[in-house]
Amino acid sequence: MKFAVIGNPISHSLSPVMHRANFNSLGLDDTYEALNIPIEDFHLIKEIISKKELDGFNITIPHKERIIPYLDHVDEQAINAGAVNTVLIKDDKWIGYNTDGIGYVKGLHSVYPDLENAYILILGAGGASKGIAYELAKFVKPKLTVANRTMARFESWNLNINQISLADAEKYLAEFDIVINTTPAGMAGNNESIINLKHLSPNTLMSDIVYIPYKTPILEEAERKGNHIYNGLDMFVYQGAESFKIWTNKDADINSMKTAVLQQLKGE
C-alpha cells in the first residue's frame, strides 16, 4: 500500500520516518513519502494523488481545511474539528478524518490515568484546540474550560463548554489539574508566552501540543516551578497510529514509531 503526507513546506516532517519505522516493525512493504504541494497548486490535488496511486494520506499545514471540498465524505470528528488530517481512499472515494484529538487524548490518558476526574484548561481556540476539546468532552465535559484572547472565536463551536478569556485563565489557573497549550506560541523560533504562570498550582500537569522544540518556553517555565510537563510528541505518534488504523485496519507499533521520532529529534 502507498501513503504520503501532504503540506507546504513539508521537508521538516517526521511522518515518513515514523510511519516507515512502523511498517518495518510489522513486516510490511508499504511506502510513505512527503509531498510538497503549494497553495497555488492545490487545485491539482486529485490529479497528483491519482498519479501517485495512493491508498491514503495525511494532510498538514496549511491544507487541513483546504482539503475538505475535495472529499466525498467527512467523518463526524473532522466535522467537529473543522479540519482534516487523514484521508482514506477507498473505491475511488476520498474519506476525511481528524485523528489529532483522539491522538492527543490517548497519549494524555497514558500519563494521566485519572483523566475523568481532572479539571482541564485548554489555551487557544484554533483547529487543534477544537479537535482536542471535542474528544476531551467525552470524558470531562463539565470540567473542561477553553480560554482564548477573543471570545468571537467560539462562535463556530457547537460544543457547550466553559469559555473564558486568557486574563481570567491566568487569574484562576490554580483551579486546574491539567493546562494544555494549543497555540503556536513556543514553536521553534517563537518565544512568545501565551499566559503568565504565576498562579499555577504545583500539582498541575502543564502540557503543550508542540514537540519541536521538545520543551517549549511555557513547559520550561512550568518545569522550573517544579511542575510535571507533557509535550506533543505522544499526540504526534498516536495520531499517526490512528491514521494507520484507518488505512489498514491494523494496530500500529507505537513503540517503534515513538523511538524513530525520538532518534530523529536527537539527531541519531
From Swiss-Prot:
NADP(+) binds at E76, G124, A125, G126, G127, A128, N148, R149, T150, M151, A152, R153, I209, G232. One of its GO terms (cellular component) is cytosol. It comes from the Bacteria. GO terms for molecular function: NADP binding; shikimate 3-dehydrogenase (NADP+) activity. SUPFAM superfamilies: Aminoacid dehydrogenase-like, N-terminal domain, NAD(P)-binding Rossmann-fold domains. The active site is at K64 (proton acceptor). Disulfide bonds: none annotated. It holds the Pfam family Shikimate_dh_N. NCBIfam families: aroE. Belongs to the shikimate dehydrogenase family. Involved in the biosynthesis of the chorismate, which leads to the biosynthesis of aromatic amino acids. Catalyzes the reversible NADPH linked reduction of 3-dehydroshikimate (DHSA) to yield shikimate (SA). Homodimer. This is Shikimate dehydrogenase (NADP(+)). The lineage of its organism: Bacteria, Bacillati, Bacillota, Bacilli, Bacillales.
